[in-house]
A protein has these predicted regions:
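Gly/Lys-enriched N-terminal cap/neck module of very large, oligomeric protein machines
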Residues: 2-206
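Single conserved hydrophobic/aromatic residue that forms the stacking wall/gate
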Residues: 204-215
Length: 215
């Protein structure tokens, strides 16, 4: 799987539609401080489902939208689209070219798409699970990431190793199944309580044998 293009519009310091093309081999993005290099990696992390504003170097999600300058008005949305060469079949059940799109409005609404089809954020995260390219994957190493891994708790480091080993998908499925089971058990308890109340009402309203004889 190879990154082919990254398209940004209204994202942080990129108000206009900006398309970056990546070829085979190593690509270096260079420029002076403040030119937006870090915003490119933020765009990749964001389109893959990142929701932590701290990881995106902001205080609120609205900060990803171009905030305007003295010469330009602020925009109402931010959009990033990632195009991947999937000819090696890393992403199962997908074509040779895969596009992932995320759009966020100042109103707080979000849109996610895979190959132009509207999906949930959960679907994007599951698509890249065990590939290392997810929002929490090991392919995105920001400043200070190595130090944070070294000082991280054992549980946090284990998640990184599980992602690298390709087994995090199963852990997430197990966690989701456990959550659904707990919810089903809670619903069953509530239903039994309601059934008990209905039975009590039925006994209370049922006529006694003497009342039935009178009738």
């Amino acid at each position: 799987m190879v990154l082919r293009t990254l398209e940004m519009q209204g994202f942080k310091s990129f108000p206009d539609k900006t398309v970056l093309n990546f070829g085979k081999g190593i690509t270096a993005v260079v420029g002076p401080n403040g030119s937006g290099k870090s915003n490119i990696s933020d765009a990749v992390r964001w389109v893959l489902g990142e929701t932590s504003t701290k990881s995106l170097r902001g205080s609120k999600m609205e900060d990803v939208i171009f905030g305007g300058t003295s010469a330009r008005k602020a925009l109402g949305f931010a959009q990033v689209q990632l195009t991947l060469d999937n000819s090696d079949g890393t992403l199962k059940d997908r074509g040779e070219i895969v596009t992932v799109t995320r759009r966020y409005y100042r109103s707080g609404e979000s849109e996610y798409k895979i190959d132009g089809e509207q999906v949930r954020r959960k679907d994007i995260r599951e698509l890249f699970m065990d590939t290392g390219l997810g929002a929490d994957g090991y392919s995105l190493v920001g400043q200070g990431k190595i130090d944070s891994i070294i000082s991280a708790k054992n549980e946090d480091r284990r998640e990184l190793f599980e992602e690298a080993a390709g087994i995090s998908r199963f852990r997430h499925k197990r966690t989701d199944a456990q959550r659904r089971l707990e919810q089903a058990q809670e619903n069953l308890v509530r239903l039994l309580d309601i059934l008990g109340e209905l039975e009590s009402c039925l006994l209370y309203t049922s006529p006694s044998p003497r009342d039935r004889q009178k009738s």
